[in-house]
Regions:
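Solvent-exposed soluble domains appended to multi-pass membrane proteins
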Residues: 1-202
Length: 202
C-alpha cells in the first residue's frame, strides 16, 4: 500500500454495542428501530454476512482495531499478552500523519479498554472521566450518567460530534457505544414515551 496514492481522508469507525440485526429495519424486512442507519445503508456498501472473531465486547475491540481474533478462553485485553507490541489501524495511520482517538462513555478502566487502546497506538482516549471533567462545561451533568455503565449514548454522541468538529485533520476515530448493554436503563426524558406493552427493556 505504500506505493499507492494514499488519500488522507478522515476515517470513523462506529461500534454499536448489542445492536442485533433484528433491530435494523434494512436487515429485517423493514421492521426495526433504526431509521437513520437504514437510510445510510441505502447508500453504502453493506455486508449481510460476516464472520465474528469474538463473542463479547472485550474481544471485539482487539479484533476490529488490531485484527486480533480470539484464540484463548481469556480475552487478549486482560491476558499477559496485552503488554505485547501490536500493529493496529491507529498505529499505521499515525505513521501517515493521522490524529487517532477512541471514545467509549463508560468508566475509564472498564475492561481495560483505555490501556489497550493506548497500547495499540490510539493517541487519545475519551471515557466518562473526560466527559465530566473535560473541556466543555455543558457536558458535566450527572443526569447524563445511566447509573450503571456510563454516559447515555445520545449525550455521548453529542459530545463526540463536538469533538470531531474541532479535531485536527486527517483523523482516525473510533466510537464504541454503551447504552444498549443490559440492564438497558431508559433516560428519564424517554420513560413515558412507551406504553407498558411496548417498553423495550421488559
Amino acid at each position: 500500500y505504500k506505493e499507492l496514492d494514499f488519500q488522507k481522508k478522515n476515517i470513523i469507525i462506529i461500534i454499536m454495542e448489542s445492536l442485533s440485526s433484528e433491530y435494523v429495519g434494512a436487515l429485517n424486512q423493514g421492521k426495526g428501530h433504526t431509521p437513520f442507519i437504514d437510510s445510510l445503508m441505502q447508500n453504502s456498501l453493506v455486508f449481510k454476512n460476516a464472520f465474528s472473531s469474538g463473542l463479547k465486547s472485550i474481544e471485539a475491540i482487539p479484533s476490529i482495531t488490531a485484527s486480533m481474533p480470539t484464540f484463548m478462553d481469556n480475552p487478549l485485553i486482560t491476558s499477559n499478552y496485552a503488554q505485547n507490541n501490536f500493529e493496529s489501524l491507529a498505529s499505521l495511520l499515525n505513521e501517515e500523519g493521522y490524529k487517532s482517538s477512541f471514545f467509549h462513555g463508560v468508566f475509564n478502566g472498564t475492561m481495560s479498554f483505555d490501556s489497550f487502546c493506548k497500547k495499540v497506538g490510539f493517541q487519545e482516549y475519551y471515557g466518562l472521566e473526560e466527559y465530566f471533567f473535560g473541556r466543555w462545561e455543558k457536558y458535566r451533568k450527572m443526569e447524563d450518567y445511566d447509573g450503571t455503565w456510563g454516559i447515555y449514548d445520545e449525550e455521548f454522541f453529542d459530545y463526540y460530534y463536538d469533538y470531531l468538529k474541532t479535531e485536527q485533520e486527517p483523523f482516525f476515530s473510533t466510537f464504541f457505544s454503551a447504552t444498549l448493554h443490559t440492564p438497558l436503563v431508559i433516560p428519564e426524558k424517554y420513560k413515558d414515551i412507551f406504553t407498558k406493552e411496548k417498553k423495550v427493556h421488559q
